[in-house]
């Protein structure tokens, strides 16, 4: 569960290393976001020659959360930390060309197919 002020790792090669959630998209009363949701983030830490720089505001898709993800078959999955992938505001395509670490298959239901195809492992 991601809310405003949550810090997340970046799981792509866009140049950002750490981001902070500044808004959860999807209605004025929406407080939390989970895997597959789109949030607005501010870049807090970035690589020197990346595509993005510190202070930029971008949209991101959450790909891993430390909070359990419950599946219809009764299984749950959780990760050690929270991670997101930066996306283009207009097209919804990832800014980076590679994705690091596993992502969950719930992204398929939310139509983030490009992220799934770039990921090394889908859990």
UniProtKB/Swiss-Prot annotation:
GO-annotated molecular function: large ribosomal subunit rRNA binding; structural constituent of ribosome
PROSITE patterns noted in UniProt: RIBOSOMAL_L14
InterPro entries attached to this UniProt entry: Ribosomal_uL14 (IPR000218), Ribosomal_uL14_bac-type (IPR005745), Ribosomal_uL14_CS (IPR019972), Ribosomal_uL14_sf (IPR036853)
Alphabetized UniProt keyword annotations: Ribonucleoprotein, Ribosomal protein, RNA-binding, rRNA-binding
Gene Ontology BP annotations: translation
GO cellular component, one term: cytosolic large ribosomal subunit
Superkingdom, taxonomy of origin: Bacteria
Pfam family of the protein (one): Ribosomal_L14
Coiled coil start-end: none
The keyword Disulfide bond is assigned to this record: no
Subunit structure: Part of the 50S ribosomal subunit. Forms a cluster with proteins L3 and L19. In the 70S ribosome, L14 and L19 interact and together make contacts with the 16S rRNA in bridges B5 and B8.
Family of the protein in this entry: Belongs to the universal ribosomal protein uL14 family.
The name this protein goes by in its record: Large ribosomal subunit protein uL14
Organism: Rhizorhabdus wittichii (strain DSM 6014 / CCUG 31198 / JCM 15750 / NBRC 105917 / EY 4224 / RW1)
Lineage of the organism: Bacteria, Pseudomonadati, Pseudomonadota, Alphaproteobacteria, Sphingomonadales
